Structures are given as structure tokens and as C-alpha cells.
């Protein structure tokens, strides 16, 4: 299955093209994807900037879909606020962004993934206002797509960036994704687009032969 948008793959591909000299160090790279043309460009500090379409959640909270909070192990009094994330042209419905009252609550969530896979919609993004150097924190679950919890999710940050930039009144933020592996993504809101900035390291090289 080819996914419409994959931040990991785009970042890694750009990194390899720069590292091997197949793309000029100071030039932009264009990728043709199911989400249209996406660009990547290396910044002065070595981080790679991805230019992706924004997927903003609806600003007003909605009633959670049946079974969502129970599958996440969240009681009604936990203070969760659910926002629908429209996904144009998607056949499996919207995603859900669930804002939680604290990073501690976010870390403690232990989903029932089989139950979560039965909830209407594509995927679930959990988020809370960040601590320390991080403006916001998140986790991402997509058991219907075979990904119980993703390590770091570019597509989720296409929704998190406009959500938190609007909430905090700033155009550039730093987010931490609190999966077991964890990761840091810098984001910039640019109208209908989002800039995602990350780092990449080559850990394995191979050779394909016919």
C-alpha cells in the first residue's frame, strides 16, 4: 500500500540525495507523490526542511466518535478535547486530534489497539502543550493501517503545526513525539503549507543487483 504522505521517507530520500552528491547541497529537491509535489531543502544548520500541505483540524471540539476515549483508556473526566481532522479525497474518513491536559496524561495513555482499530476514521493524534524546550508533545496511533504507534510522524505534524501555531500565536514551534523511540520536529506555519524540519543519519548502505 502506498501512503499519500510519508515524512520519514521524504526526509531520508533527501538526505541520501544530498549525501551522495546526486543533488546540489544548496538546492531544493522536488518529489512527486500521491499528495502532489513535495519539496525538500537543506538549511544552514544541516536540518532538512520539508514543504508539505497543511491538514488543519477543525477549530471547535466535537463529540468523540463511538469507542474512541474508551479505546485510549481515557475516562470522560480526563479533560480530553477531540477535534476532527478532515482528509480531502480520503476513503477511510477523517483522523482525530485529541488534546490532553498535560504531558503526563499523554505519556500515560496505553491504548487497546484492537478496540482503537474499530473506531471510525483513519488515525488518532494525541497532543498536549509541551514542557521545557518543546512547545507541544504528541503521539500517533494508526492500527487500521498496521501501525499501532508510529515513532515520528510527518503527516501528523501537518495537523499539529497549524493547531498549535494558532493556539500559541506563533509561526515556528518545536514538537516532541513521545513514542518509545521519541523524536523532535521543528515546524513552521506557512499559510496552506507547513514546513517540517528534521535531521537524518545514514546507518546502513546496500547494493541492489539485477
Task: Specify the residue positions occupied by each region the protein language model found.
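Active-site proximal loop and beta-alpha junction motif in alpha/beta enzyme cores
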Residues: 1-210
